[in-house]
Amino acid sequence: MFIRSLGIYLPKERMGAEEIAHRAKLPLEVVKEKLGILEKPIPGPADHPAEMAVWAAEEALRGANLGPETLDWVISIVEEYKDYPVWATAPYLAQRLGAKGALGMDLNQKCASFLGALEVARGLMATRGAKAILVAGGYRNGDLVDYQDPHTRFLYDLAAGGGAALLTREGPGLRVLSLAHRMDPELALAVKVPVGGTRTPLSPEALSEFYLRVEDPQAMKARLDATSIPTFLKVIQEALEEAGYTSEDLDYLALLHMKRSAHRAVLEGLGLREEQSIYLERFGHLGQLDPILSLVLARREGKIREGSLVALAVAGVGYFYGAAILRLEGGVYA
């Protein structure tokens, strides 16, 4: 299976580090250096998650020079917080794109959803004869950030955008050599919007709590301090082993946005140099779309060339971890 082409949509509006610092009452240098945010895209009036997914998908189809009629499946990784509640988006993406013959599904692993979608797509190609699968998502969880809540400081980077990947059975493109996944159920309830579900239905009184919250900040910090970086390294190593490589063979690491020290810790753990990755300090965190954005930027900056070995690594609250090993074969990807 190959990643044949990619698409990214980013809103024009930006929130700078200065505004984040002002809202959160933090020193500017803490936002820039510790949190690793110089600026991030924020949504305009028309930038709804499913719409942004459509715009990114259109770019991916153009990049591969393929029409929507060629798609066998549409896998939507549009974020759970989206245009409408209790709404599946794969049919909408197919309708908007004109993929009338495609089958579809929605998939949600929070910020690890792209890796889950690659796993499902690989299975569809192996067992269902699929030849072309579109994975597309949109994200604007920045709406759910309460900058007055210091316990959610690690979420201040949440941004907005759309991303898509066109997967094909044949190349050229980034061949998916291996996938690896891990899950830590100890953090199952750690991060969530506490109102608006069946346990605490939305009401006028509950509106002020319609933000992402951390249930037990001290317990979550202790757990992540002990497990986060080691688990990132383990899942990447598992993917490398499945592909028959070691970290010494890697040319590029596409890593989701995280605080600057954590990004460096993952690179150091793999023995990689800083120039072998792109730190998304001008984009913030686009959730499950970070690896797509990183691959697009790496191609533009010449960090991925023919034969390059690439690792993707992600994590999503819940907690999910995932990694993939890719190799560019048969020409550049769009």
Which residues fall in each region the model found?
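Glycine/charged-rich beta-loop-alpha catalytic/anionic-binding loops adjacent to active sites
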Residues: 37-39, 73-76, 95-108, 144-149, ...
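Conserved beta-ketoacyl condensing-enzyme motif
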Residues: 3, 46-110, 115, 242-263
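Condensing-enzyme catalytic core mediating Claisen C-C bond formation in acyl metabolism
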Residues: 1-45, 151-223, 234, 327-334
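Claisen-condensing/thiolase-fold acyl-transfer catalytic domains that form or cleave C-C bonds
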Residues: 50, 54-57, 81-82, 100, ...
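Acidic-glycine-rich active-site phosphate/pyrophosphate-binding loop
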Residues: 24-33, 84-98, 135-144, 204-209, ...
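Buried hydrophobic positions in well-ordered alpha/beta secondary-structure cores of metabolic enzymes
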Residues: 3-5, 31, 60, 74, ...
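Flexible, glycine-rich active-site loops centered on histidine and acidic residues
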Residues: 126-161
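Acidic, glycine-rich active-site loops and adjacent beta-strand->loop/helix elements
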Residues: 8-9, 77-82, 109-112, 137-142, ...
